Amino acid sequence: MSHALRAVFLDHASLDLGDLDMRPLHAAFDELQLHAASQPQEVAARLHGARVAISNKAPIDAQCIAARPELELILVSATGTNNIDLAAARERGIVVANCHGYGTPSVAQHTLALLLALATRLPDYQQAVRGGRWQQSSQFCLLDFPIVELEGKTLGLLGHGELGGAVARLAEAFGMRVLLGQLPGRPARADRLPLGELLPRVDALTLHCPLTEDTRGMLGAAELALMKPGAFLVNTARGGLVDEQALADALRGGHLGGAATDVLSVEPPRNGNPLLAPDIPRLIVTPHNAWGSREARQRIVGQLAENAEAWKAGRALRVVNAG
């Protein structure tokens, strides 16, 4: 087996749109082969002869790992590692390292942009102008949709890590009061309110937590009914945190003031989704691109290169399967 350090990026088009400086990543390896995307059945063959695999969402399962004895390092160009069989990699002595913190400014600004769009009814007013309603108004302005001022309102956060903290700071800059919620399955903390106490108290709720067995479906019909009438919900975390049919029903029924989500339970939603129905009012759906600024994607390139260089030097950096 050659000792040349050959790497294969299985789905680089999920990261680089031709606008990034990829030189740091190329410099980390003797050879870097790029594939725009890889289907599950293509992964093992494409990793033939590679000591390093790079993947965003392309699956590297136990069968693939067993078929590629030359594989030594898996770099994930994202935070989530659900597409990697971590146990199989650990058993084989393969290091798995991810990226994190790269999208905090971008996701935080996207979260606030969605909240502001809900509060100002921005999509409705834009559609009204395009439809000629302002042009036909008897007044100089159009006030057909109620506008909510965020100053003095209460924002609830579910998840208060780096990203939740960034959103809290932005919300406070708008004059909002911030309350923190207790996540299911986590030890109780004095500064966290149980979900049943948090939901009736907040004017808006934003989600910034991982999807686990404890958090899956944590906002269902019963929880949404606990929220204040007219409250806003913004999800830039994971689609599975929210019962999507229950959310669609809550919006159709008029209980919530609006909702916005950057994530769905299955992505892309090739077979449809309850939240893509055309009759749901006051709903904004964006295509899981809150993280996708050029600046954030360039940070991923840097972290991938850093992780590779650390591994070459015998150091662990952002390793997720140690032990």
Task: Say what each PLM segment does.
Residues 36, 77-78, 94-105, 182, ...:
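Short beta->alpha connector loops at strand-helix junctions that form conserved
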Residues 96, 233-323:
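Rossmann-like dinucleotide-binding domain for NAD(H)/NADP(H)
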Residues 1-50, 312:
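N-terminal glycine-/charge-rich "phosphate-binding" loop or analogous flexible N-terminal tail
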Residues 164-165:
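N-terminal Rossmann-fold NAD(P) dinucleotide-binding loop
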Residues 92, 100-154:
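Phosphate-binding beta-alpha-beta segment of Rossmann-like dinucleotide-binding domains, i.e.
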